[in-house]
Structure formats: structure tokens, C-alpha cells
Amino acid sequence: IIDSIFLDHSSRISTFEFDRENTLVLEDTTYHFDIYEFKNPILPGDSLKLNFTVRNKPNTLLRNNSPVLYNGTFLSNQNFPSLGYQGYELTDDKTREKYGLPPNELKPLPSDSTALGNTYISKDSDWIDFEATVSTSVDQIAIAPGYLQKEWVDGDRRYFNYKMDSKILNFYSFNSADYQVFKDSWNDVSLEIYYHSGHDYNLDRMMKGMKAALEYCSENFSPYQHKQLR
């Protein structure tokens, strides 16, 4: 049973909304960490939906505030809120002693089966189901993990829906730019190189390298498990 959620978020302007009644019981404006307590706890097999918005200040001449750029945006889920607080735990024993904490025993034992299930990517989740709809400028291409399911234009916005057919690690990113696309294939694998116009001098070499890597690794390690390589 889960009666509260620890939400770790950045200093960017954010809003959070859960789909069940809750109370904000702690708001740490220094480390941007909140604790929400639910009126009705989450039971085994239950689920919880979190809607959130994240905004940032615009970039200036001397300060980089935003990864959203005019023609070359790269966003990852590290810009989004995450669950838990482990990243803020004090690890140095002298510092822990100063605050009356016991010595650092945060590293799990090699025999800890729960810890063995964690990945180096994140602490709040390991393998996830992924689907995303991304909106960008009408003259740009947005890229996300997974296979493109649908693409459409609505007004001055262009939309892309991506979905992965198997679980992925809890790290994903979004790219958007005025891309050109160089396409080819290797066996049944779709190959794509996204590039800016004018930066096409080595596309053939890159594509040749992709095919060589697929051929070598499939022969010496295991068959390539996906339907595309971008």
C-alpha cells in the first residue's frame, strides 16, 4: 500500500496533477522536492496517473536556460519529474556524521536481489512501456523512441505518434529540427539518417558503417532485435 508520493523535479516552472485526491505535505523549494499524501492509498495492482507541465525561461546571450532551440532541440526525460529521493541522500561519512546520520550503508550487498533488478539509468523505474505524441513546428521533424504510428498536421503544428513494441529502459529523448532524411535498408531493418541540409558529405560512409555494424554484430553476438536503426 502506498499512501504518499515523493516527487523530485527541477527548478523549472512546473505544475503537477494526480488523478486522485491528495494533500501537499512538504514542498522543498531549495532542492525542488515535494511529498504528496493521498486520501485513498494506492493498493496492490492499482495505478496512478500524473499530469504535469514543465516550462523554462528563454535563453539569453550569456545564459543557457532551455534545451528548446530554434532548429536543433534535444529533450530527455531528465527534464521531467521523477519519483523518489535517493539522489539527494548524503553519501560522505563525514558529512553524514555532521548531521547525526549513521555511516554510509547505501550501497546494497551483491546478494540483494531487489537491487540487482535496478539499472544504472534511473532509480524510480527500470523497464517501461513507451508511447508518445510529440508536437513541433510544421516545418520540422520530431523524433522519439519507437516506431512511427501516425503523423499529421493541425494548423501550424506537426504531430508524430511513436510507440515501442517492447519495454525500454527509463531513459528517452525527443529531437526536433528541420531534418532531411537519408533512407536505406539492411535485410528487413529500416535504416535512417536525419541530417541538416548541407551536411550531407559523408552520408554514404555513415550508411555503409551502419550496415557493417549490423552485419558484424548480428554474426558475432546476436541477431539485431529491432526493425529500425536511426
Regions found by a protein language model. Name each.
Residues 27-32, 150-158, 184-187:
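Short, ordered beta-strand-loop transition motifs
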Residues 51-172:
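Extended, low-hydrophobicity, Ser/Thr/Pro/Gly-biased non-transmembrane segments
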Residues 48-53, 170-185:
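Extended Gly/Ser/Thr-rich low-complexity repeat segments
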Residues 44, 48, 124, 206-213:
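Hydrophobic (often cysteine-bearing) scaffold residues that line and stabilize catalytic clefts
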Residues 132, 178-230:
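Juxtacatalytic substrate-recognition/specificity segment
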Residues 20-24, 143-149, 177:
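Small-residue (G/S/T/A) turn/hinge positions that recur once per unit in extracellular repeat modules
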Residues 2-73, 118-119:
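A surface-exposed beta-strand-loop module
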Residues 3, 12, 32, 128-130, ...:
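Residues that flank catalytic or metal-binding motifs in active/ligand-binding sites
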